[in-house]
């Protein structure tokens, strides 16, 4: 028993001597710093492990044929996109960031910072990914591109019958579902611009809008999808002094699927606030058919009536046919679009044919 006590005392003496040697010249403040540094490193490692990042992308090769005066050179083109998504948990909420980059990283094409608050919904700041009323600007079914895609002064500019008062850039976005109905609202202050950090945009009207979407389960109709939305661009303010009142955007759609066939119909109105502004009324329909799990075809028509306040109204009439074949990550798609009285110009016609091969990864 006494022999074991001697061994224990000897070990304590050796450990005490080693600690004195190691800590010689180090005060308690230094020891605290070492401890805090180690703790901070542990916390950083923990946060990094809690985050997830994914990368996706696509490459698109196209052949485009338009009017003889529009395509006079090489009709082939290519586009590549990369999208980065990062997400992690902060105080019980999921914070995620999305950014898509243009060809050769020439710049940011869209970005989105969002906070998923569970039952309280999702709050986001959007720089081009899609929010509010713009998410249902054209819901008619198609196998490839929309009826207006690729035509002169097409709806991608935000005019020509496509609703979306707040737009997609520089907007705050809130999404939540109540009783089977999804609310998607957007609001911006001033012009809708993709500002970088520390920057501000030029003058422009503030705007807000929302979209409501649901399915047919509330009505006992499987295969039915419904939606409607409304928005205003506020004019006559310091930011936008255009006289005549606010711009109003509204739309409603219904799509019904039965087996391999989907039919959709949509109406929209854009009432301009300016005294001499041109209002727009839109009606469109589309029919899509899935031949099998790989092949689909579609056809649709779209009319836009331009209500000219001091001239005869002009009705733009467009139609388009599309086909798409998917095999794994590869997709081959083609569409042919035509329009008469294009963009409120009587007698002006346009046409576009495109064949595209894309690879997703």
Which residues fall in each region the model found?
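Outer-membrane beta-barrel proteins
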Residues: 2-361
